[in-house]
């Protein structure tokens, strides 16, 4: 069997928080384009490790609905800004970042006092605005992880009651699209060409993301090369897909869209990843408006984008 080739045909890394690359993998046996594309897409979106702010402690603040004197944003807005900050940690241990700023000034990520193991991807990323006489003193916990972690799970691991927990999105890959084309060479048997587009948040390049995803898949399937009939310990812990842990209730959909998905046995974000935007319209009583609502909720809350259409399929 001939080995396929991979080529990066387009790349854009000018924006700090939005890196893009387009890859072509060919030639693949017929049917393998969809198999490889779907597997890579799922792993890229769900299984790569990233960095996120998981908790914030602000001086003089005991809950997220408070305000800080002299700061234009309320605490909830500050927390949302911190959730969006793109960082990269080189440590497997949780790290603590700090901020101490007096007004008047506009606070950006460049004001953070970070450990040497942590890098800020975009120093210009906006956090808050402080007026004359105002002051913002803050500590925040930085962790590495995969997928999405809700506040409830994070609270169990909290090290201090003073910290306000944050729903954390660790996924460094924002979006993945793929399509499959049929190619022929000199009248030979038709083959598949896989076109794969990858967008990341800048903490990892699309090339690094693709390499890591391929490594995960290789490690996953490698034991199948030498199948043993000897009984094995079936009680070993198998890590869950982080995306599978997110119920569709977290998307806060309308009652109509929610009920339609439930009737179609779509109970989690992992189930949704098996659908394209075109597939959603085939769900009974699921109209264009509901499909747009689901797509928008996935993008806004988790940074996930469903493909517009099905990949090309050839009989």
From Swiss-Prot:
One of its GO terms (molecular function) is protein dimerization activity. Pfam families: RNA_pol_A_bac (PF01000), RNA_pol_A_CTD (PF03118), RNA_pol_L (PF01193). One of its GO terms (cellular component) is DNA-directed RNA polymerase complex. Signal peptide: none annotated. Residues 238-315 are annotated as: Alpha C-terminal domain (alpha-CTD). Gene3D superfamilies: 5' to 3' exonuclease, C-terminal subdomain (1.10.150.20), DNA-directed RNA polymerase, insert domain (2.170.120.12), RNA polymerase, RBP11-like subunit (3.30.1360.10). GO terms for biological process: DNA-templated transcription. The keyword Nucleotidyltransferase applies. The keyword Transcription applies. Keywords: DNA-directed RNA polymerase, Nucleotidyltransferase, Transcription, Transferase. Its EC number is 2.7.7.6. Belongs to the RNA polymerase alpha chain family. In cyanobacteria the RNAP catalytic core is composed of 2 alpha, 1 beta, 1 beta', 1 gamma and 1 omega subunit. When a sigma factor is associated with the core the holoenzyme is formed, which can initiate transcription. The N-terminal domain is essential for RNAP assembly and basal transcription, whereas the C-terminal domain is involved in interaction with transcriptional regulators and with upstream promoter elements. DNA-dependent RNA polymerase catalyzes the transcription of DNA into RNA using the four ribonucleoside triphosphates as substrates. This is DNA-directed RNA polymerase subunit alpha. It comes from Trichormus variabilis (strain ATCC 29413 / PCC 7937). The lineage of its organism: Bacteria, Bacillati, Cyanobacteriota, Cyanophyceae, Nostocales.
């Amino acid at each position: 069997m001939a080995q396929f080739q991979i080529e990066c045909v387009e790349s854009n890394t000018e924006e700090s928080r939005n890196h893009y690359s387009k890859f072509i993998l060919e030639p693949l046996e017929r049917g393998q384009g969809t198999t490889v594309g779907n597997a890579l897409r799922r792993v890229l979106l769900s299984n790569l490790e990233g960095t996120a702010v998981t908790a914030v402690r602000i001086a003089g603040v005991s809950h997220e609905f408070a305000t800080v004197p002299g700061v234009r944003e309320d605490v909830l807005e500050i927390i949302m800004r911190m959730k969006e900050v793109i960082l990269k940690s080189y440590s497997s241990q949780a790290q603590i970042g700090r901020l101490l700023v007096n007004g008047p000034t506009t606070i950006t990520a460049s004001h953070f006092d970070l450990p040497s193991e942590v890098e800020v991807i975009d120093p210009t990323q906006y956090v808050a605005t402080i007026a004359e006489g105002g002051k913002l003193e803050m500590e925040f916990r930085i962790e590495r992880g995969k997928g999405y972690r809700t506040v409830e799970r994070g609270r169990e691991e909290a090290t201090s009651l003073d910290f306000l927990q944050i729903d954390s999105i660790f996924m460094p890959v924002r979006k993945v699209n793929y399509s499959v084309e049929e190619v022929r060479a000199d009248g030979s048997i038709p083959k598949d060409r896989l076109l794969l587009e990858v967008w990341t948040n800048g903490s990892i390049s699309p090339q690094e993301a693709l390499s890591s995803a391929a490594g995960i898949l290789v490690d996953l399937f490698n034991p199948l090369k030498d199948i043993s009939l000897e009984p094995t310990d079936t009680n070993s812990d198998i890590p869950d897909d982080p995306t599978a842990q997110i119920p569709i209730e977290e998307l806060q959909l309308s009652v109509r869209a929610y009920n339609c998905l439930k009737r179609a046995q779509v109970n989690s974000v992992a189930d949704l990843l098996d659908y394209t935007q075109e597939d959603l319209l085939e769900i009974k009583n699921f109209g264009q408006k509901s499909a747009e609502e689901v797509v928008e909720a996935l993008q806004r809350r988790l940074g996930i984008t469903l493909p517009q259409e099905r990949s090309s399929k050839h009989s």
